[in-house]
Amino acid sequence: MWGETFDDFENDEGEMAMAKQNLIAEPARADFTFAKLPLGIQPVDFMKTHFAETAGKSMQFRKGTTTLAFVYEPATPADKGGIIVAVDSRASSGEYISSKSVMKILDIGDRMVATMAGGAADCQFWTRIVAKYCTLYELREKTSITVSAASKYFANTLYGYRGQGLSVGSMVAGYDKKGPQIFKVDSEGDRCQLKVCSVGSGSLNAYGILDNHYKPKMTDDEARKLGLRAIMHATYRDSGSGGVCNLCHITPTEKIRLPPMDVSKLWYEFADELGRDITYNPVE
């Protein structure tokens, strides 16, 4: 019982021995319950089929994603302006879709985020390092770090590990005393500032929409729809992109995360706007 000590058993050697045995016994093995894989997916068989010695393929997983960000000014006094950051949610390992619900917009500060493109582990780890540095800077200096300084620290850190196999293609976007800013950073230590940027295997498709519809001044609704539409087109033309569209709107005063939008629903909404019937009707 709780509160008892070995002195309570000094008159009974048998009970004392049993108490000691109970205290030094190995703990019971934890019983973890994991979610079952979807029907039809057998990872072991998949690996043997695609990457065994007889398959003729090397184990070099191709990565795929689509991330974008752009700066815009408010078109009316009722709009807030700022930065739109939009991403898909698919994580792929070559031909294998490993996840459909990855959050690729990672928080760095109150009004600053970083996106993920490349290796998920590399992006998540180094983004956490940058977020920790930004927090320590703000505690030490008693002021918020700028987007430029955060991205410079990110690029310098990655430059120190260039040539060692890292796979990082990130955008650091945020609002500071200099206004809205977007910096593109990669695993080679490159860093550049852009007003409109897209990174990932589906970036060419996203750029096609952004180049045609982006305007320096837009309403908040127009900007959000542009981000959603660019991601939607990328997911339908790039096999490495898919899932849902996660969108973040960074304004001068706050960071707004919108609910995830299914790209399939976005595709049908876009078709309705064009008056196009995309329903599959097989000819008998």
UniProtKB/Swiss-Prot annotation:
Keywords, sorted A to Z: Cytoplasm, Hydrolase, Nucleus, Protease, Proteasome, Threonine protease, Zymogen
MF terms (GO), sorted A to Z: endopeptidase activity; threonine-type endopeptidase activity
InterPro entries assigned: Ntn_hydrolases_N, Pept_T1A_subB, Proteasome_sua/b, Proteasome_suB-type
Inactivation phenotype: No visible phenotype. Constitutive skn-1-dependent expression of the proteasomal subunit rpt-3. Double knockout with ddi-1, sel-1, sel-9, png-1 or skn-1a results in failed expression of the proteasomal subunit rpt-3.
Catalytic activity annotation: Cleavage of peptide bonds with very broad specificity
PROSITE patterns xrefs: PROTEASOME_BETA_2
Alphabetical list of SUPFAM superfamilies matching this protein: N-terminal nucleophile aminohydrolases (Ntn hydrolases)
A single Gene Ontology CC term: cytosol
Class of the enzyme per the UniProt entry, highest EC level: hydrolase
Residues making up the propeptide: 1-64
Source taxon at top rank: Eukaryota
Enzyme Commission no: 3.4.25.1
Subcellular locations according to the entry: Cytoplasm; Nucleus
Active site, UniProt feature: T65
Pfam families: Proteasome
BP terms from Gene Ontology: proteasome-mediated ubiquitin-dependent protein catabolic process
Description of how the protein assembles with itself and partners: The 26S proteasome consists of a 20S proteasome core and two 19S regulatory subunits. The 20S proteasome core is composed of 28 subunits that are arranged in four stacked rings, resulting in a barrel-shaped structure. The two end rings are each formed by seven alpha subunits, and the two central rings are each formed by seven beta subunits. The catalytic chamber with the active sites is on the inside of the barrel.
Stated family: Belongs to the peptidase T1B family.
Biological role stated in the UniProt entry: Component of the 20S core proteasome complex involved in the proteolytic degradation of most intracellular proteins. This complex plays numerous essential roles within the cell by associating with different regulatory particles. Associated with two 19S regulatory particles, forms the 26S proteasome and thus participates in the ATP-dependent degradation of ubiquitinated proteins.
Protein name per its UniProtKB record: Proteasome subunit pbs-5
Species whose genome carries this gene: Caenorhabditis elegans
Lineage: Eukaryota, Metazoa, Ecdysozoa, Nematoda, Chromadorea
Designated gene of the protein: pbs-5
